[in-house]
């Protein structure tokens, strides 16, 4: 197991996992996410190849539609 910081919270994950593995484990919709890994935005095309290591910091932001056009 390794320790990462996910959205500001410590999290233990299995060693050798990628960003895509993490997204899958969290059951998040990949098409609506932005991922920052150690202060760098990672393109979705690289999620499978970007391995997570002990001490990494990951921020995952999920885009949600909605709002009111009348208040613009």
Locations of the language-model features?
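Eukaryote-biased recognition of intrinsically disordered, low-complexity regulatory segments
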Residues: 1-7
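Compact, glycine-rich, soluble single-domain proteins
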Residues: 5, 14-47
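Bateman/CBS regulatory modules and CBS-like beta-alpha motifs in cytosolic regions of diverse proteins
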Residues: 10-12
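Loop/turn positions that initiate beta-strands
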Residues: 55-58
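Short, Lys/Arg- and Gly-enriched loop/turn segments at beta-strand edges
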Residues: 65-72
